[in-house]
């Protein structure tokens, strides 16, 4: 097989607000680096209580369609100026449903959505769309946050200032977190990036009250986990990927955010199921807190991601 059917498929969901610019940058840059096909979707949503069947509202819908089509043409021109070809889609309806329908129709391998500034998921570009897409999309979802002070930089256009040199992957050794490591490894190969594997020693995760354990026991557990992470980093190194690992104590989401800031990470890749913490995806406090507060993009990988026929980068770490 050859042609576009072989290439990765990226879907960018946008409302064309200034907060969507950063997500546009990432979608275009990933499409260029991966040699992927890129589809841009915008969804026209009627205000609550407005019946689209009324003639006057049909006129309103026509104006929305005209404005949306114009914005898609402009985005396509911006991308074409950088050698990036893309397809466009425009839909009417409930944004989250239309995004998920487009994911299915396009058989997307990745969805890119944006979030606005400091309140994160409370102000997702498409209302509650990003949260619902992350919960239910069959493919990974890249959530790109944008703060007010990032807007002027993003207005430079796609691929301005984007780097994916350092990737952080929280690991709890569940199947889903190992699938996230696998996805991150593939991204690291594509972008010549380094990986940092992070395990947070949270007492509740192991059914233990560390305040009652002797220091020697705590160190024994830490050493065992450090050794296991060491095995994974060696497997990554054998795959020609620069990697290191960390074992930290504390509250999981705070440790993840602190590590991301310290590295500093350009991307966090997280599994959406697992033992605890990362296990509950958006319905749990850890991943939700990371998505709300992370200054760098967060890529969520829903498990199971890879079928038995997938040739893994980390064959020794197969789930």
Model-derived regions: residue spans:
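Short helix-capping segments at alpha-helix termini
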Residues: 78-84, 235-241
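Glycine-rich phosphate/pyrophosphate-binding loop and the adjoining helix
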Residues: 196, 200-226, 232-237
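Charged docking surfaces used in two-component/phosphorelay signaling
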Residues: 90-99, 247-255
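Well-ordered alpha-helical segments embedded in enzymatic catalytic cores
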Residues: 23-26, 71, 98, 228, ...
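A short acidic, glycine-rich active-site loop
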Residues: 57-70, 214-227
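Gly/Ser-rich helix-loop-strand patches that form or flank binding pockets
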Residues: 1-9, 29-33, 100-153, 258-318
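Small/aliphatic-rich secondary-structure junction motif
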Residues: 2-58, 161-211, 244-246, 293, ...
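Rossmann-fold cofactor-recognition segment
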Residues: 85-89, 243-245
């Amino acid at each position: 097989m050859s042609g576009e059917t072989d290439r990765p498929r990226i879907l960018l969901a946008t409302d064309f607000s200034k907060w969507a610019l950063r997500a546009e940058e990432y979608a275009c840059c990933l499409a260029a680096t991966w040699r992927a096909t890129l589809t841009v979707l915008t969804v026209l949503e009627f205000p609550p209580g407005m019946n689209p069947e009324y003639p006057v509202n049909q006129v309103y819908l026509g104006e929305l369609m005209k404005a949306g089509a114009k914005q898609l043409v402009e985005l396509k021109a911006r991308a074409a100026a950088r050698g990036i070809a893309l397809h466009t889609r425009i839909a009417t309806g409930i944004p989250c449903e239309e995004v998920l329908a487009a994911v299915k129709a396009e058989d997307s391998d990745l969805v890119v959505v944006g979030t606005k500034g400091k309140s994160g998921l409370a102000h997702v570009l498409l209302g509650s769309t990003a949260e619902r897409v992350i919960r239910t999309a069959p493919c990974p979802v890249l959530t790109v946050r944008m703060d007010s002070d990032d807007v002027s930089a993003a207005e430079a256009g796609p691929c301005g200032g984007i780097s994916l040199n350092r990737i952080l992957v929280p690991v709890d050794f569940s199947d889903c977190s190992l699938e996230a490591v696998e996805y991150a490894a593939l991204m690291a190969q594509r972008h010549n990036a380094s990986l940092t594997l992070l395990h947070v020693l949270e007492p509740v995760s192991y059914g233990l009250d560390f305040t009652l354990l002797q220091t020697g026991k705590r160190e024994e557990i830490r050493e065992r986990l450090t050794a296991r992470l060491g095995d994974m980093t060696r497997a990554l190194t054998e795959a020609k990927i620069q990697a290191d690992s960390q074992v930290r104590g504390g509250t999981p989401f705070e440790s993840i955010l602190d590590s991301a800031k310290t590295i500093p990470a350009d991307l966090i890749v997280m599994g959406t199921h697992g033992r605890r913490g990362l296990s509950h995806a958006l319905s749990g406090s850890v991943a939700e807190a990371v998505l709300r507060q992370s200054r760098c993009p967060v890529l969520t990988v829903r498990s199971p991601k890879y079928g038995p026929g997938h040739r893994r980068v980390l064959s020794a770490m197969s789930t």
